[in-house]
Amino acid sequence: MRKLNVLSVLILMLSIWMPLTVEAQMPTLSNKNKSDWWHPIGIKPYQSSKKGIGFISVKGNKFVDENGKEIVFKGLSISDPDKLKKDGKWSKKHFEVIKSWGANIVRIPVHPISVQQRGIEEYLTLLDQAVSWSEELGLYLIIDWHSIGNLRTELLASDAYNTTKKETFSFWQTIAAHYKDVPTVAFYELFNEPTIYDGKYGTCTWGEWKLMMEELIDVVYAYNKKAIPLVAGFNWAYDLTPVKDHPIAREGIGYVVHPYPGKRKIPREPKWEVDFGFVADKYPVVATELGYMNEGDDENLLNDGVYGPSIVKYFDQKGISWVVWVFDPVWVPQMIKNWDYEPTEQGAFFKDVFQGKFKYK
């Protein structure tokens, strides 16, 4: 009888806790507010109602489609869906305009504060809409955990970027489970811009960062082996020099760089090659942010008249995919002047590149 009681208790415990171990995810607001918290509400997988585009995978230093054909991505970042929703501009039209410009990929920056305020369930509703629209339009997506700073010490650049290692891992656990077998959501940019900011955010070695990213990639792959994790280097996602001797020890990934004009002086190409370009000879590289403007307070973004043409030519030579920041009339450097989608100077330039009007030679 005693053995039976012990067995019954074990079965009861398993029935209570099994959903949490099998369907691990970010804490949901509804569960926090539920009186019967021992019956958790799980986040269900995304259900596509459309036959979308095929899966992307890594082959050597290239991204390839299901037929093995190389794809070089050229696209843009939108602003955070939470901002767009509050602006009254979150709609399929936004993605239709992007498609009409000629982009083949959209980067979605997810700020920790927007998930914290809105809650993961409601935020996933926004992402699901983006996925549905992108499926219809034939666009691929990068989901970007848009934090800046040192994840090891959890010292971040501002309240908008504040997160923890646990929250970061839980976010990707949720995304990987929710969008498993969804080819449109091709890339997971694990952490936007790692930096120790000259020690102001504490210390973190490349070895420590490498181990953390490898652990996070393992979590992603446990849920979704078809995802392509993207890993950034230090110095606000600019410096990939440690990859030469100590690459991320996981297959199927890509590397991230944010080569804004202020990072290097003219001539930039030899320095780009040393800082990140060499990585593209062996692994896929995506410049998930780049861009410029003619005036403003941020010297890192200021145009010198040659940056745009020189960087797209360099990417073309190296086979590097790229994504321009940012398709918003307020966030800088802007690609559009207003919500009539009138392009700025950089917007017009990159639109021409998307549409094949730029002459590389």
Feature locations, PLM:
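Bacterial N-terminal signal peptides that target proteins for export
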Residues: M1-S8
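Extracellular glycoside hydrolase catalytic/binding regions
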Residues: F55, D87, D159-A160, K166-F187, ...
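NAD(P)H-binding glycine-rich loop region in Rossmannoid oxidoreductase-like domains
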Residues: I108
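Bacterial N-terminal signal peptides
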Residues: S8-P19
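Acidic/histidine-rich helix-loop elements
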Residues: N67, I71-K93, V115-R118, L156-A160, ...
